[in-house]
Amino acid sequence: MADLEEQLSDEEKVRIAAKFIIHAPPGEFNEVFNDVRLLLNNDNLLREGAAHAFAQYNLDQFTPVKIDGYEDQVLITEHGDLGNGKFLDPKNRICFKFDHLRKEATDPRPYEAENAAESWRTSVETALRAYVKEHYPNGVCTVYGKKIDGQQTIIACIESHQFQAKNFWNGRWRSEWKFTITPSTTQVVGILKIQVHYYEDGNVQLVSHKDIQDSLTVSNEVQTAKEFIKIVEAAENEYQTAISENYQTMSDTTFKALRRQLPVTRTKIDWNKILSYKIGKEMQNA
């Protein structure tokens, strides 16, 4: 191990540490960070060299953050990244600084961005918040209105998690939806992601995603938002149902086939007669 450490440059050590951090399971960032910190044994090198990994993790995970003075949480995503550690809260029309290591928001300030699609964004956000409240007890959503390639675009992000460290499991749901505001009809593009880690007496992870495409009729803001939510609800329900059914099928077939019904002797052990078996005698003499 000592020879290996001598062969690795600081750059290589940081690269390896960054990979561990970026792939940390949901809810386990601090544990992975602390382990990597012990392995690297150089806090300055870790903070400076792996800072991009801290940021990438929060962006990828749609990390929710509470801003002092504001009721609703906002998601940390690439769509709200204003650069220099600042992020946008489109609902409250503010920007704030975000510490990617501490996961804390500070210095909220008014932010008025030019957004011709604000009325559309607001309508979608209102409808999406109602949907999230109904379907995700711990859910958070953030809706952006941006101009992409000259087209007004709505981007809706949803995050919901359950962290149960005492029960040895953590999980997170993420979904991202986009559509451009064009006359008559437009295409809705979405991606749904599930990540779950179970680690009691083992180490099992579920990492799954599904891409979605559908057409959306564009009329006025309110009606379009309602139709958009119908697409979101149908797709997310179908995906979650499919995941559950697949696990049931695996339990009934794949996993069952892996389990041995009888010992190698093809005979069940009569535990009341264990002493008459050779193994029982060996245990007595041990």
UniProtKB/Swiss-Prot annotation:
Q: Which UniProt keywords apply?
A: Acetylation, Actin capping, Actin-binding, Phosphoprotein
Explain the purpose of this protein: F-actin-capping proteins bind in a Ca(2+)-independent manner to the fast growing ends of actin filaments (barbed end) thereby blocking the exchange of subunits at these ends. Unlike other capping proteins (such as gelsolin and severin), these proteins do not sever actin filaments.
**Keyword Cytoplasm (UniProt):** no
| Annotated gene | CAPZA2
* Gene Ontology BP annotations: actin cytoskeleton organization; barbed-end actin filament capping
Q: Which family does it belong to?
A: Belongs to the F-actin-capping protein alpha subunit family.
Which positions carry N-acetylalanine? A2
**InterPro entries membership:** CapZ_alpha, CapZ_alpha/beta, CapZ_alpha/beta_2, CapZ_alpha_1, F-actin_cap_asu_CS
Per UniProt, subunit arrangement is: Component of the F-actin capping complex, composed of a heterodimer of an alpha and a beta subunit. Component of the WASH complex, composed of F-actin-capping protein subunit alpha (CAPZA1, CAPZA2 or CAPZA3), F-actin-capping protein subunit beta (CAPZB), WASHC1, WASHC2, WASHC3, WASHC4 and WASHC5. Interacts with RCSD1/CAPZIP. Directly interacts with CRACD; this interaction decreases binding to actin.
Question: Residues where Phosphoserine occurs?
Answer: S9
Ribosomal protein among keywords = no
The protein here is known as: F-actin-capping protein subunit alpha-2
Pfam families, sorted: F-actin_cap_A (PF01267)
Q: Name a GO molecular-function annotation.
A: actin filament binding
Output a single Gene Ontology CC term carried by this record. F-actin capping protein complex
